[in-house]
Amino acid sequence: QVKLTLGEIRSIQVNVMGEVVVPGTYTLSSFASVFHALYRAGGVNPIGSLRSIKVIRNGNTIADLDVYDLLMKGKMKDDIRLQDGDVILVDPYQSLVQILGKVKRPMFYEMKPTETVGTLLKYSGGFTGDAYKKALRIIRKSGREHQIYNVDEMDYSVFRVDDGDKITVDSVLQRFENRVEIRGAVYREGLYQLDGTMNTVKQLIKKAEGLRGDAFLNRAIIDRELEDLSHEVIQVDVKGLLNGTAADIPLQKNDILYIPSIHDLK
């Protein structure tokens, strides 16, 4: 026969110092880890570092915990079991930056000196679907004023962020590279793709499933946006175009073709 006797779990005393909500000496279970001690101390305060939480044992630093490893990667390699007399020291953060705009987790992040824009983008969850990914903008304090840096995509992995930086990721422009539109007396009004198989007025009318019976064939117009954002109006002989007596008209991006109804003329 084997007889087991359960004894009491041994307690240890740990000092939690520095930038925590309630610094002091805490009595913990001998199975307690660094996170248990931080929880008892109320967590890190607003100026405390989450990137470098030191465990000091017998005067030597035996672990340097980066909470981001747990939050971002699920790693807990430095959340070691504590021993009696251990000291947990939380220093003030060194670098706090803010990322705004079209990322999945826009907020403040604590960054290490060697970390880059690319690292920050990973922490923030990456771009949203409507983000402009080719470049971003950084506002940085410089003495008594600020400076703006436009960082291109190729430099994300090498451009280091600095304390106080404000990074903004813009959205893509609300413009289209290959859009045309048809309105009026056709069966399917709306937006269409300008491509190799559909790039003329006649082809657009066909794509819209043709003209309705009330379409006015003697005149239609194209509203065309020019490079200076002014507009040009082009007259279209729809009847001549369909019977082959008038040349088809090539379309350009953002053209809007209006086919009036005979009822509009009354």
PLM regions with names:
Residues 1-266:
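Ser/Thr/Pro/Gly-biased, low-complexity, turn-/loop-rich segments
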